[in-house]
A protein has these predicted regions:
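Regulatory hinge/linker segments at domain boundaries
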Residues: 181-185, 286-304, 372-373
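Regulatory input/activation interfaces that engage signals or partners
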Residues: 1-164, 168, 172, 254
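The N-cap/first-turn positions of alpha helices
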Residues: 305-309
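Short, basic, alpha-helical segments at the C-terminal edge of helix-turn-helix-like DNA-binding modules
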Residues: 349-360
């Protein structure tokens, strides 16, 4: 049940907003304002997510000091806590409050102790994963300052009611961005880059990394001269968790589109500095066709099995080879292909591959470059 008739009107307005063709930064900014009018909060992070790795790829921040960013990502990727975004994305309840998860004792949450209290947000925290078609395209973390101001079930219901619309809006933004991406010159940022981190700042970076970072700076989640963009911090945090406690996350790799319109792959890894203190580095490189295909296929609303079939087809497997690899009959595979073609709007395997690589990869890659190079 929503909080009020006014909340229902706001929900409908937000649904229309999510299907209006806004790009991701503008959509997140508009959502921050619209939701705040119904579900009061004092600070928030509205984020885009890579549906394959469930890592944050960009963020719109409301009223949170920039100094809180390292603590936010450290808690999300290095430490165990309640209501992790990745768990919400995989769970049956994609929206949850800290007060409910801790039985009303907020101090049981590390996020509350290490970030909330330190930066003046002593109240409740509401977190949401925005999921559509089984894929998570975004998330939100809403915080309150007043220790007595707990989020209500009506607040949770309202945010849950807009979740699929937000996910669809962010998914559409990714696809629409591919169509309006500018062309590139042959030499722009083609080589992989390496960034070595000291907390949330750069300790060392290769020359090629600077070009990639420039494409992220000024985009939502990164400002020129500011700390690292959200996507880099998220991947570094995930790699740090893998280093720190021996429990690797599902992936330390994320894919996103830069403000220049290119697909960027980020990969976090550990470097042995020889000093006894492990360092975290992030590789920045053009996204590879297989990982790009996974994101694009999710954006078209394909099921997990349909994505598996599409990957086989795009890689050039025959019907018999694809069916054998997926342990299904050729007839079942053909049924999946029919559904895939309908969703993507193509009529053949060749058109499917062309849709993914010509429209989403080659159009944003350096001129003359080849996928996978």
């Amino acid at each position: 049940m929503l909080a009020s008739p006014g909340a229902e009107g706001a929900r409908r307005a937000i649904a229309r907003m999510c299907h209006s063709g806004l790009d991701a930064p503008d959509l997140l900014g508009a959502l921050a304002v619209a939701v705040r009018e119904v579900v009061g909060y004092d600070g928030a992070v509205w984020a885009t997510m890579d549906p394959a790795s469930l890592l944050i790829t960009g963020a719109h921040v409301e009223e949170l000091p920039r100094e809180s960013a390292p603590a936010f990502y450290e808690n999300e990727y290095l430490h165990d806590d309640v209501n992790k975004l990745s768990r919400l994305a995989r769970g049956l309840r994609p929206v949850a409050t800290m007060s409910e998860a801790t039985g009303g004792v907020l101090s049981r949450s590390r996020l509350h102790r290490e970030l909330g209290l330190v930066f003046g947000f002593a109240g409740d925290n509401l977190r949401a994963a925005f999921v559509a078609g089984g894929s998570c395209w975004g998330a939100a973390a809403l915080a309150r300052r007043d220790p007595a101001a707990h989020f209500t079930q009506a607040d949770v219901s309202f945010v849950a009611s807009i979740g699929s619309h937000v996910a669809e809006g962010l998914r559409a933004a990714m696809l629409l961005g591919a169509l309006s991406a500018p062309g590139r010159s042959p030499d722009d940022g083609e080589a992989p880059g390496l960034v070595v981190l000291d907390g949330d700042r750069i300790r060392a970076a290769s020359a090629s990394a600077e070009g990639w970072l420039e494409e992220l700076a000024g985009d939502f989640g990164g400002r020129p001269g500011d700390r690292l963009p959200a996507a880099v911090l998220a991947v570094a945090g995930a790699a740090g968790r893998m280093v720190g406690d021996g429990e690797p996350p599902p992936s330390t790799r994320a894919v996103l589109r830069t403000r220049a319109g290119r697909w960027l792959g980020l990969h976090g890894l550990r470097l042995d500095s020889g000093s006894g203190e492990p360092e975290v580095a992030v590789i920045l490189e053009a996204a590879r066709p297989p990982e790009l295909a996974a994101v694009v296929m999710s954006a078209y609303g394909l099921t997990a099995r349909e994505r598996d079939v599409a990957q086989q087809v795009i890689s050039g497997a025959s019907t018999a080879e694809a069916a054998a690899a997926l342990h299904i009959s050729p007839y079942t595979l053909q049924d999946h292909l029919k559904s895939i073609f309908d969703k993507v709007g193509v009529r053949s395997r060749a058109e499917l591959a062309k849709e993914v690589f010509d429209r989403h990869y080659a159009a944003a890659a350096p001129l003359g470059g080849a996928p996978g190079r």
